[in-house]
Amino acid sequence: MTRPETPQAPDFDFEKSRTALLGYRIMAWTTGIWLIALCYEIVSHLVFHHEIRWIEVVHGWVYFVYVLTAFNLAIKVRWPIGKTVGVLLAGTVPLLGIIVEHFQTKDVKTRFGLRHSRT
């Protein structure tokens, strides 16, 4: 009697995951910096009545790219939906996105052995 063919799960692609992690890390820091700049712009507008309107536009586009890169990483490392949403929302709080990036990077590198290159 022959065994039925069962589909195999695709192998984990370390290089794609490493690239996704790098993109996420860069965008988490970039989003955090632009969010701090946006907070400065809001204080400057409300307290000193300065008009700096381009920072919010740049931050919006940077956050959009952050969402894409974080979602890409979530798919690559198979995060559950709750964790993915938490990481995405962390990018909306000043400094929290950078803190979450640190812990998520540490977790992904530990879980998948991305500390050393695979050959």
From Swiss-Prot:
<comment type="similarity">
    <text>To M.tuberculosis Rv1342c.</text>
</comment>
<keyword id="KW-0472">Membrane</keyword>
<feature type="transmembrane region" description="Helical">
    <location>
        <begin position="80"/>
        <end position="100"/>
    </location>
</feature>
<keyword id="KW-1133">Transmembrane helix</keyword>
<feature type="transmembrane region" description="Helical">
    <location>
        <begin position="55"/>
        <end position="75"/>
    </location>
</feature>
<protein>
    <recommendedName>
        <fullName>Uncharacterized protein ML1176</fullName>
    </recommendedName>
</protein>
<keyword id="KW-1003">Cell membrane</keyword>
<dbReference type="Pfam" id="PF12823">
    <property type="entry name" value="DUF3817"/>
</dbReference>
<dbReference type="InterPro" id="IPR023845">
    <property type="entry name" value="DUF3817_TM"/>
</dbReference>
<keyword id="KW-0812">Transmembrane</keyword>
<dbReference type="GO" id="GO:0005886">
    <property type="term" value="C:plasma membrane"/>
</dbReference>
<feature type="transmembrane region" description="Helical">
    <location>
        <begin position="28"/>
        <end position="48"/>
    </location>
</feature>
